Amino acid sequence: MPDVIVIGAGVVGAACAYYATRAGLDVTVLDRGPVAGGTTGAGEGNILVSDKEPGPELDLALLSNRLWRDLSTVADFEFEAKGGLVVAETREVRDTLQDLAIKQGVEHQVVPGAGLHAYEPHLAPGLAGGVFYPQDSQVQPMLAAARLLAAARERYGHSALRVRTGVEVKGVSTAGGRVTGVRTGEGEILAPAVINAAGTWGGEVAAMAGVDLPILPRRGFILVTEPLREPLIRHKVYTAAYVTNVASDSAGLETSGVVEATPSGTVLIGASRERVGFDRTTSLPVLSRLAAQAVALFPALSAVRAIRSYCGFRPYCPDHLPVIGADPRVPGLYHACGHEGAGIGLAPVTGLLLSRLLAGEQPDLDLHPFRPDRFAFARETR
């Protein structure tokens, strides 16, 4: 019998499995699809501090950034400490970006308009300036999930970690109000602890245990270009509107210019956000808008072909904070979901914090802001 079952083999579930195995626990990971078959496989691989408001999520991001750098020495998942450049079209927006960077208290360099081309020679002229964040990084998310799982087996014992894909969890088993395991299409698996790392489907898993988590899908599209012969973009580059959209509560369509290159030479173009359920219908108007915004940032992209697009669903929480920790309503149930667009970046810290709880140790950060029952408490106090 495993010590803990992790539901979800995306990058968050993989990180939970890695750190729990490192802590000496026997772990079974279950997923109805393949490893990284959900939101992880539709992500750009961002590890950002630049888009975080000062507070609990930024604290998570800073620790997770350091953990990603450590993990990059354990496994190869195309970790790039490339830095992020946030650009502004007007002086007013530039000043707002500068104020945010100061409040964040993170490493940054304010860049005047005349200095932008030292960072990105192919940027469009006329921008008012921006802020460069050297800590912003990127990984290949599917590689990260797969290789974290592989590293856990190789470093901490093949028998300590079992990964079972194509196995759908049908229910969470309890006795006396406490978790005793899960029910799957292949039978029941017993364990004293279950981690809900089901991402956008985290609310469904929580409901199986009789608790509510208001996690909603927030759709986003990404365009992928043909590989470029010569590097065109050095960093992750995005407009100030991206920061605004990340913090938005709107269910309607919001887009912002986001452009970055990959080690293979392709360019990833985003970003869009909208709450339309799990509708995967390709939206040509959205893709056209993304392409236009990218060309506005980098005019040379007008001569580059887009070869494909894809969409994914970010796990959105109403207060824009992830759900991390033990659920007091059902002892033995732990949550690691609701990270919205920051799941890849926050995966290691999520896994580390939960491994501390499972091992009976003090977490590295205060988990109170991320507690699973905070939404029920908010409703009761209205």
Question: What would you call each of these model-derived segments?
Answer:
Residues E44-Y119, A128, S256, Q293-V295:
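Dinucleotide-binding Rossmann-like beta1-alpha1 core, especially the glycine-rich loop
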Residues D3-T28:
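N-terminal Rossmann-like FAD-binding beta1-loop-alpha1 element of flavoenzymes
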Residues T21-G41:
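Glycine-rich FAD pyrophosphate-binding loop
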Residues D59, V86-V93, F132-A150, T281-V286, ...:
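Short beta-strand to alpha-helix junction loop
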Residues P2, A23, P328-R382:
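C-terminal lid/capping helical subdomain adjacent to the catalytic/cofactor pocket in oxidative enzymes
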Residues V131-G185, I189-P192:
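Helical element adjacent to the flavin cofactor pocket in flavoenzyme catalytic cores
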Residues I5-I7, I189-W201, V205, G351:
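Short hydrophobic core segments
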Residues Y18-R22, G45-I47, D76-E80, R178, ...:
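Active-site substrate-recognition segment that forms the wall
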